[in-house]
Amino acid sequence: MKRFFVFLIATALISSTALAKPAQVSVTRTTGGNAVEFPNKHIPSGYGVNKLIPLNKELQTRHDIKSADRTHKMLERNSSALTGLLINKGRIVFEGYKEPARSTSKMHSMSMSKSLTALVIGNLYCDGKVNSLDDKAIEYAHWLDPNTYGDTSIRNLLMMASGMKKQGEYGQPIRKAYERLRNQKIAVPWVLSNNQNHSRTHKQGTNHLYNSGDTLALSQVTRAFGGLVKNFNYFIWSKIGPEHEGSWMVDKRGHAISFAGFNATLRDWGRLGMYTIDMAKGRGGSCMQKYVQDMLSELIRNERRPGEAGRAFSAYGYQTWIMDNGNAWWVGYGGQRVGINVELEKVMVVHSYIENYMTEVYDIFNYFADQD
């Protein structure tokens, strides 16, 4: 009996170690490979107003300097860290890269593109194309299953509150959805179809269940107005003055892989964070102000289920994680992050290939965003 008890303890320890293994991605694909190795729709640079101010040490405050020093040490100390960027009211406070990442590298989003999808939906709503966030997705994407994703409201899809059961690891709606979409084996509508035996485990709107199928369903709503890539370019990318081309990974039918498929340079990721702050501050009109404020707010509690994504966060907004202190985070598997503090207009961007130092990332941003 004693030997059996010891065996159980050892097995539990091994299982815990396996579960605790940090998320890891390909360093080559994260630093630009995904934009060339697989089919993408590319969107041009050079349009809109570039509000990002280059690093100027004469403009830095003491707090900027201390925050930059902490970020620099973080990059040096962690071998899996690839990039780091701090922005204070449009000014670059710190910018750093580690090989093979460079200033021209198209850094991959993983799930940070979920938040970009939410921004597109907000623009379609405020432009009068989507009538109400409480409309069912099937009203705009009639091919969706009327019993599952199609019957879910846009608002509940935004909050990851469809109640739909995920069938794959890391929030994937079916097994290996990301890999199969990227490798041109399947298409987004097929992933969401009733052929996949999707089922609802909770009444929609009642529980947060991290499921990338919700993001794919949102991208299908955008097809009624030209698709995700077209609207992302029109409403967002063409307005921020990007330095370099952006690239959306697509499936075999040309549908954007909305839950994990955008590639952009580090500074352009920073510009996307600044755009989000601009919208939340009312610089894009009152409708987008209300929408983005909701997007970055605690709309639904994070259940923090064992083994689930986002254990560091207390709540969820619209396709965006929220911390107890109110800071909002775009989160990508393997250590991709954009931190946003609207009140002080601060942004942090990091990219990685192993997600093994995120506590330090959060601590630095909390420090950076703690004072003006």
Task: Show where each model-derived region lies.
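Structured C-terminal helix/loop/strand segments within mature extracytoplasmic catalytic/sensor domains
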Residues: A20-V27, N327-D372
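Active-site helix/loop module of the DD-peptidase/beta-lactamase fold
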Residues: H108, D127-K165, A224-A260, A264
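N-terminal leader/targeting segments and the immediately adjacent pre-domain N-terminus
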Residues: L13, A18-R102, C126, V130, ...
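Active-site-proximal loop and beta-strand segments within enzyme catalytic domains
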Residues: K73-M74, R102-T104, L124-N207
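Active-site SXXK
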Residues: G90, H108-S132, L157, L218-T222, ...
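Active-site Gly/Thr loop motif
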Residues: P242-G246, Q293-V347
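Active-site-proximal alpha-helical segments within enzyme catalytic domains
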Residues: D214-R223, A260-G282, Q336-S352
